[in-house]
Amino acid sequence: MAKHEIEERGDGLIEKMVAVNRVTKVVKGGRIMAFSALTVVGDGDGRIGMGKGKSKEVPVAVQKAMDQARRSMIKVPLKNGTIHHEVIGRHGATKVFMQPAKEGSGVKAGGPMRLVFDAMGIHNISAKVHGSTNPYNIVRATLDGLSKLHTPADIAAKRGLTVEDILGVNHG
């Protein structure tokens, strides 16, 4: 696994490289080596995308992954640098549990999840991985969980209630 790089290009997006693997294809004449890169791209304000790229050279694979991540960005509702509610994301044999944390708690998450949260602009969150710790699965499970997040206003509209009813604010 390569070191995690943080880059900012002219478009203001935060790019992070999660993993680079050397892959081998065995053919009749021998082995063909290539590189596979996994990256995440975020805007620091709730938008995040994941990309994979393959090439015979590392920089080309990383660039392909960054381009794919830019094209696959999703918007996630945030609340003061954390998430609105607890959520579970799944992908393959990986299960990711995320819950909001108080201001000043920091990011309590391991490896690839930390990179996703940094690129998104989440500063206070607690997260745990159960099952497979493959970086590809962790990133996909994290994005699955984040895509399930809803704001209190969304939930109130869906249930036909007011936001105060959802949040349990006392009327007295």
Curated annotation (Swiss-Prot):
One GO CC term, this protein: cytosolic small ribosomal subunit
GO MF entry, a single one: structural constituent of ribosome
Gene Ontology terms: biological process: translation
Gene3D superfamilies assigned to the protein according to its UniProt record, in alphabetical order: 3.30.160.20, 3.30.230.10
InterPro entries for this protein: Ribosomal_Su5_D2-typ_SF, Ribosomal_uS5, Ribosomal_uS5_bac-type, Ribosomal_uS5_C, Ribosomal_uS5_N, Ribosomal_uS5_N_CS, Ribsml_uS5_D2-typ_fold_subgr
Entries under PROSITE patterns matching the protein: RIBOSOMAL_S5, S5_DSRBD
Transmembrane region(s): none
Domain S5 DRBM: 13-76
Pfam families (alphabetical): Ribosomal_S5, Ribosomal_S5_C
Subunit composition and interactions: Part of the 30S ribosomal subunit. Contacts proteins S4 and S8.
Family membership noted in the UniProt record: Belongs to the universal ribosomal protein uS5 family.
HAMAP family attached to this UniProt entry: Ribosomal_uS5_B (MF_01307_B)
Domain notes: The N-terminal domain interacts with the head of the 30S subunit; the C-terminal domain interacts with the body and contacts protein S4. The interaction surface between S4 and S5 is involved in control of translational fidelity.
Function recorded in the entry: With S4 and S12 plays an important role in translational accuracy. Located at the back of the 30S subunit body where it stabilizes the conformation of the head with respect to the body.
Name the UniProt record assigns to this protein: Small ribosomal subunit protein uS5
Primary gene name: rpsE
